[in-house]
């Protein structure tokens, strides 16, 4: 059995296959998944799993070079942003895009992870780094 916190097979597979510059999106329950992009649906009920728990589990395995957030997040300040601030040392450089442009960016993601999070704009694009 794996020793790291991340147990989801599909999510572990995607992370293991990511290379430098690849994108993984973690989204709230309402974020649309573009056609042709793999969706890893973790949502069970509203709020379960929450965005923060999924982000922490992903960061246990993924080396992140930078991350992208929607500008609208700064106005709404969902709990996800509080967790992102807490984890900023593991997230690399930050970039801001409009929510519409964030959705355009998600078209080039290796996968979109759908959480049960129901707070608006609780989405992040993680751009993979290297460990060497």
From Swiss-Prot:
Alphabetized UniProt keyword annotations: Carbohydrate metabolism, Cytoplasm, Isomerase
Domain of life, per lineage: Bacteria
Localization in the cell: Cytoplasm
Name used for this protein in its record: D-ribose pyranase
UniProt family annotation: Belongs to the RbsD / FucU family. RbsD subfamily.
Pfam families: RbsD_FucU
GO cellular component annotations of the record: cytosol
Record-listed substrate binding positions: 28, 99, 121-123
Keyword Cytoplasm: yes
Catalytic activity: beta-D-ribopyranose = beta-D-ribofuranose
Purpose: Catalyzes the interconversion of beta-pyran and beta-furan forms of D-ribose.
Pathway per the UniProt entry: Carbohydrate metabolism; D-ribose degradation; D-ribose 5-phosphate from beta-D-ribopyranose: step 1/2
Active site: 20 (proton donor)
């Amino acid at each position: 059995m794996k020793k790291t916190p991340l147990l989801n097979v599909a999510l572990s597979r995607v992370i293991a296959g990511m290379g430098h510059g690849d994108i993984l999106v973690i989204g709230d329950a309402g974020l649309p998944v573009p056609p042709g992009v793999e969706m890893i649906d973790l949502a069970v009920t509203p709020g379960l799993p929450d965005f923060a728990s999924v982000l922490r589990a992903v960061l246990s395995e993924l080396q992140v070079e930078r991350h992208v957030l929607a500008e609208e997040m700064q106005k709404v300040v969902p709990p996800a942003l509080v967790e992102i601030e807490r984890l900023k040392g593991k997230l690399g450089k930050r970039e801001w895009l409009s929510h519409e442009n964030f959705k355009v960016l998600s078209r080039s993601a290796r996968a979109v992870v759908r959480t049960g999070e129901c707070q608006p704009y609780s989405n992040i694009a993680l751009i993979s780094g290297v460990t060497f």
